[in-house]
């Protein structure tokens, strides 16, 4: 089915691709295939952002819902992805955030688009931190089921990298988080 999604995407038919992704997502939920659930979420998000105006809020809320329903290590992966979604939103709208006044509390606890810069960065930090929970277990986690999501580095002995290395790298330096960390300091 992913081949169909890719074909529809190449043909410029995101609506058709989204229908196939929704089918994949339903099957993944039924089969409790966490890697396919996460992959389908990423593609649903991608197509929502193409097809719907202001889809960011829905995408973020979908990730929060899935995090609440997931277990280790899927929760950790989703937390990392959510932090990155917030970070990408900041990157695309940094001028707006730099012009906002800091508020005492979140103006709207659900709609991150109304938050000030400090509130957004606190949320990013929270989700990166959550992605690193159970660090020792993450380092020992077998990633084979997540090959559909990650480009896994193969060590010289042929064993696969630990999830903790991938998520830890993401939380500390991936996706432009260096700027975030420097700003926080």
Regions of interest found by a model, annotated:
Residues 1-185:
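Extracytoplasmic/secretory-pathway proteins
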């Amino acid at each position: 089915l992913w081949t169909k999604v890719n074909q529809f995407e190449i043909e410029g038919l995101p609506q058709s691709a989204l229908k196939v992704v929704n089918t994949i997502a339903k099957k993944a939920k039924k089969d409790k295939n966490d890697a396919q659930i996460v992959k389908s979420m990423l593609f649903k998000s991608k197509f929502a952002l193409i097809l719907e105006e202001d889809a960011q809020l829905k995408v973020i809320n979908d990730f929060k819902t899935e995090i609440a329903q997931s277990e280790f290590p899927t929760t950790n992966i989703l937390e990392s992805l959510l932090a990155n979604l917030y970070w990408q939103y900041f990157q695309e709208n940094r001028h707006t955030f730099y012009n906002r006044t800091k508020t005492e509390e979140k103006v709207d606890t659900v709609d991150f688009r109304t938050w000030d810069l400090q509130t957004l960065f606190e949320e990013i930090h929270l989700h990166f931190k959550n992605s690193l929970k159970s660090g020792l277990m993450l380092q020992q986690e077998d990633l084979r089921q997540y090959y559909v999501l990650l480009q896994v580095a193969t060590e010289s002995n042929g064993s696969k990298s630990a999830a903790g290395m991938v998520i830890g790298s993401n939380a500390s330096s991936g996706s432009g988080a260096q700027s975030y960390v420097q700003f926080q300091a």
